Amino acid sequence: MMKNKLFIFINVFGMALAIACCIVAYFAYEYQATFDGNHTNASQIYRVSAIREFDNEVTRWGYGPLPLGGIVEQNFKDVDKSSRYHFSYSNFKRENDLFESNLSYVDPEFFEMFSFEFIKGDPKALKDVSSVFISDKMADRLFGSPEEAFGKTITQVYRTNLKEIKIAGVFKEQPQNSSFHSRDAFMNFENCKDEHVASTDDNWTQEATLFIQVNDPSRVSAIHKQLQPYIENNNKVREDFIIKELALDHFPTMAVNDQAAFVRSWTWSAPPPAAIVGSAVMGILILLIACFNLTNTAIAISSRRLKEIGIRKVMGGLRKQLIVQFIGETTLICFFAVLLGLVFGEFLTEGWNTMWPYMRVTPHYLDNPQFLIFMAVILIFTGLLAGAYPAFYISNFEPISILKGKLKFGGTNYFTRILLGLQFAISLIAIVSAIAFLQNANYQKEYDLGFDAKGSVIAWLDSKEEFETYRNSLQSNPQIISMAGAASGIFSNRVNEPVKHESKEVEVDIIDVGDHYLKTMNLTLLEGRDFVQDSETDKRESIIISQKMATMFGWEKPLGKEVIWKDTTKLYVVGVVKDVHTMGLWRSLEPLMIRYIGPEKYSQIVVNAKEANVPGLNKFMEAKWKEIFPNRLYNGYMLVENTDEVDNVNGNIVKMYSFLGVIALMLSATGLFTLVSLNIIRRTKEIGVRKVLGASIGNITRIINTEFVVILSLASIAGSVFSYFAVDLLMDSIWDYYLSTTTQTFMISIAIMFVVSAAVIGYKVFTAASLNPVNTLRDE
């Protein structure tokens, strides 16, 4: 080993990087596997979810009818505990300082069901409707410490209402892999009625999440059956929300399933599959490349140890002793790589965390027995995978053949060529993936969503008077192109409900907008007209639809067509707009129906300006807000923030595959460097003889490089074919609208691989070809 320090160091470094990737993958998996594991009663808790089916598509909702909470508490004897849950936001005031915080409304048994670590206070005080429980993070923000916050009185500000509430407890913030992470304030559910006047116990038009605790799992099936009759109560009054089944979601797997099925809920979902599967794929691929590297190096180095092996076998050495020695040496290399990998893992996890802002992977080694077992398995696996073939193959040679010099083993044989080809094929797949997602990111960034996402700012208001006052204050800004009011709009509060035309029923996105909304959001009117200002007829019966809605109903001439909404309301098409992606590219294009409303129903203002002026406009709107509404925090936001998430996901995937590509290519290139170097050493005399016979440097370079060029070419073909299907399959699982791989994608990727390979081995080959044959043949 000591005679080959450079090659051993290269392999230790490469293996350490691979093991560091496996460490990230392990803790990413642990993060998801232990999601909500901090709750002692997790295995006994279930969420009541609503299952809907429309047009043969089944969807799951993480909440159900509000009255179910009271019904279950009073009538379901098999349920041991229950709590409703509603998530909202509120402003809190301490003296003259105003703070915004999320706020969860729950029933008194909530803290008995879920595990919260209380620093101060008694969770039983949740029965008091005038109390609030806050996290230690919120306590630090308001008062500097949990001890200072406990027992203090703060003011809840909701619209124009002020309510004095007492801080009855301070709890430690939930871990990041918890459904209730970053939930900073909890109040008794009865307070929800102050925010939502319609939230009465018998109002089936309102929703809430309902959690139940069932200590005896054999009773769950009976509870599920007992829930089903109440579906009818909902469906009688909610034609827009017809439920097929009330299901029970087991809490330990709820967050993971919510993420997989895109369930709408008020709790945190588990990380996206790309964060878990991506890290695992990255770790496995890089580990395989590192193992192939070490195997190739061991095979190549063995050509310089054949005489040692022959002499040991002549002197009575047993084959199993040689096997143990070879595998032991390889395992020792892997052991040093594990130690270095633990160090690299600390840095790599920090980089991984920056890619997924809602996921915090924290490595912890010595206090984690499962991790230590995992590392032991990695050590044994890599030692055997990298060392088994050289050990068993070389130890099987006959000593007579070795000592007579009949064996020409080492350099590159069929096995090493296959391993090297696999390394570069994997590297190419990673490079293609990175470039393809980068191209897709640019494509989606410029994708026409059907509205102006980059030039709009939205703020929420509570009344017609507030809207008019705020709008008038903004009119002095010359950068504003247009303003409009709405109750619901694109990316904000839209609903999805069925409408009928004759015998056909279609579920459509519905938004309620006021004057100038089409102009402000830059919606393109293709046919018909916009709404007439202050027209009572338009408010009552006119709609503007998207192309998609016209297509789904099969209308070639949609103007004047009648649809029925909520079984009784007749609406008539007066205009058609270009298709609008109301939720960006996260889901397939949905049909859109736009209704006209008056200022008395406005709950938001939409302001449009040139893209370059939007950040400044947002600051201007915030300044005006503080003047007009001093007791409320500014709630405006740039609409582009909603579409930025698409860019972030694309960016994270590009980073992940770029990292994989760089590491894989680097490891493959070092493996190529090792093989070329050892091959040159083995062929030094051959090179000298060729030069004596008149071979030029170019000829010798071509002879040495030919087999490696062939290997890279075959790897390019294999990697291109596999990545063509794999990358498209991956993109299709994430997006409905994406840019497939192109010829340019593969040309750039293959060029990168060849250029890097040439740069790595070019100097080494040229130096060998330039050697003076007198020096190389001196011993002959």
Give the ranges of each region predicted by the language model.
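Intracellular coupling helices
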Residues: 1-10, 14, 292-333, 396-407, ...
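Mid-to-C-terminal secondary-structure elements
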Residues: 107-120, 132-271, 472-646
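Small-residue-rich transmembrane alpha-helices
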Residues: 24, 247-249, 331-397, 439, ...
